[in-house]
Swiss-Prot record:
<comment type="pathway">
    <text>Cofactor biosynthesis; adenosylcobalamin biosynthesis.</text>
</comment>
<dbReference type="Pfam" id="PF01891">
    <property type="entry name" value="CbiM"/>
</dbReference>
<comment type="similarity">
    <text>Belongs to the CbiM family.</text>
</comment>
<dbReference type="GO" id="GO:0009236">
    <property type="term" value="P:cobalamin biosynthetic process"/>
</dbReference>
<feature type="transmembrane region" description="Helical">
    <location>
        <begin position="108"/>
        <end position="128"/>
    </location>
</feature>
<keyword id="KW-0813">Transport</keyword>
<protein>
    <recommendedName>
        <fullName>Cobalt transport protein CbiM</fullName>
    </recommendedName>
</protein>
<comment type="function">
    <text>Part of the energy-coupling factor (ECF) transporter complex CbiMNOQ involved in cobalt import.</text>
</comment>
<feature type="transmembrane region" description="Helical">
    <location>
        <begin position="36"/>
        <end position="56"/>
    </location>
</feature>
<keyword id="KW-1003">Cell membrane</keyword>
<keyword id="KW-1133">Transmembrane helix</keyword>
<keyword id="KW-0169">Cobalamin biosynthesis</keyword>
<keyword id="KW-0170">Cobalt</keyword>
<feature type="transmembrane region" description="Helical">
    <location>
        <begin position="71"/>
        <end position="91"/>
    </location>
</feature>
<dbReference type="GO" id="GO:0043190">
    <property type="term" value="C:ATP-binding cassette (ABC) transporter complex"/>
</dbReference>
<feature type="transmembrane region" description="Helical">
    <location>
        <begin position="208"/>
        <end position="228"/>
    </location>
</feature>
<feature type="transmembrane region" description="Helical">
    <location>
        <begin position="135"/>
        <end position="155"/>
    </location>
</feature>
Length: 244
C-alpha cells in the first residue's frame, strides 16, 4: 500500500512539473487555424484519413473481442488529452507540449491512437483554441500517426532485444514525442522554405527551436508514462498483458 501511494505521489509530481511550466499566454505548438495554405490543409487530410479509417476498424475489433477494453481506451485518450493540452513556452515565444501517445501506443498499437489522438485534437481546437479545424489533418498526421507509429516500432524493437517493459515504454513515449515534433518541423518547412537553404534549412531551423524545450519535456513525459504503466499493471493486473 505504501509503495502504491508513493507511485501515485510520483505520478502527480511529474504531472505537476509539466503543469507548472504551462502558460495560456503563448500560441500553441499545434499548427494554428489559418496558418497553412488550402492546398496543404487538403493534402494532410488526405494523407491522414486512411490511418483514421484503419484505426476505427481496429478499435471496433478490440471492443468486440473484449468489451472491458473500453476502460483502457478511455484512459489512453484522457492521458493524451491532458498532456497534449499543456502549453510550455519555447525559446521563440511559441510553445511545446507533451503528446501522451506512448501509453496507448504500447497497449493497443498505433492505429488506435490515430483515432484517439484525432478526437483529442478536435476537442482542443473547439474548446481550447489549441490548433485548428483546417489544420486538423496536419496536426493529426504528426501527433496521431507519425509519433505513434515511430514509437511503436521503437517499442517493439526494445522488447525484441529483451529490454524490460518499463524501459521499452519510456523509450516509446520519448521517441513518439520527438517524432511528432520532427514531423511538424517538416510540415512547416514545406510551407515556409528558407530563402537561402530552402525546405531542408527551414525544417532544421524549426527542429532546432522546438527541440530546445522538447527534449526535457519528452523525458518527463516518458517517466510519467512509466509511472502510469506501473499503476495499471499493479492495480489492474488483467490489463498488464496488453503491454506485449
Amino acid at each position: 500500500m505504501k509503495l502504491l501511494k508513493n507511485k501515485k505521489v510520483t505520478f502527480v509530481a511529474l504531472l505537476a512539473i509539466l503543469a507548472v511550466l504551462s502558460t495560456q499566454s503563448v500560441s500553441a505548438m499545434h499548427i494554428m487555424e489559418g496558418y497553412l495554405p488550402l492546398f496543404w490543409c487538403i493534402f494532410w487530410f488526405a494523407v491522414f484519413l486512411p490511418f483514421f479509417v484503419v484505426g476505427l476498424m481496429r478499435i471496433k475489433k478490440i471492443v468486440a473481442e473484449d468489451p472491458n477494453s473500453k476502460t483502457m481506451l478511455a484512459l489512453s485518450g484522457a492521458f493524451i488529452f491532458i498532456l497534449s493540452s499543456l502549453k510550455i513556452p519555447s525559446v521563440t515565444g511559441s510553445s511545446s507540449h507533451p503528446t501522451g501517445v506512448g501509453l496507448g501506443t504500447a497497449m493497443f498499437g498505433p492505429s488506435v491512437i490515430s483515432v484517439l489522438g484525432t478526437i483529442c485534437l478536435l476537442f482542443q481546437a473547439l474548446l481550447l483554441a489549441h490548433g485548428g479545424l483546417t489544420t486538423l489533418g496536419a496536426n493529426a498526421f504528426s501527433m496521431a500517426v507519425v509519433g505513434p507509429f515511430v514509437g511503436y516500432f521503437v517499442y517493439k524493437f526494445a522488447k525484441s532485444i529483451k529490454l524490460s517493459t518499463p524501459v521499452s515504454i519510456f523509450i516509446c513515449a520519448v521517441i513518439a514525442d520527438l517524432a511528432t515534433y520532427a514531423t511538424t518541423s517538416i510540415q512547416l518547412g514545406l510551407v515556409f522554405p528558407d530563402a537561402n537553404s530552402g525546405f531542408v534549412g527551414s525544417a532544421l531551423k524549426f527542429m532546432g527551436v522546438f527541440l530546445t524545450t522538447q527534449i526535457p519535456i519528452a523525458i518527463v513525459e516518458g517517466l510519467l508514462t512509466v509511472v502510469l504503466y506501473n499503476l495499471i499493471s499493479e492495480n489492474v493486473k488483467e490489463r498488464a498483458g496488453l503491454f506485449k
